């Protein structure tokens, strides 16, 4: 069984760039997305769609 650090699909936290501290948790494929993930998602604190960046 693969260890957590070498998993192909690790669990990552996406943190809001609006500075609200709101986060989403998702999985990503390291082979297809080796860079930090950036997704545009809804932040309910500011009630807008903002960029969410992967934090390590």
Swiss-Prot record:
Belongs to the bacterial ribosomal protein bL33 family. NCBIfam families: PRK00595.1 (NF001860), rpmG_bact (TIGR01023). This is Large ribosomal subunit protein bL33A. One of its GO terms (biological process) is translation. It comes from Nocardia farcinica (strain IFM 10152). PANTHER family: 54S RIBOSOMAL PROTEIN L39, MITOCHONDRIAL (PTHR15238), LARGE RIBOSOMAL SUBUNIT PROTEIN BL33M (PTHR15238:SF1). It comes from the Bacteria. The lineage of its organism: Bacteria, Bacillati, Actinomycetota, Actinomycetes, Mycobacteriales. One of its GO terms (cellular component) is cytosolic large ribosomal subunit.
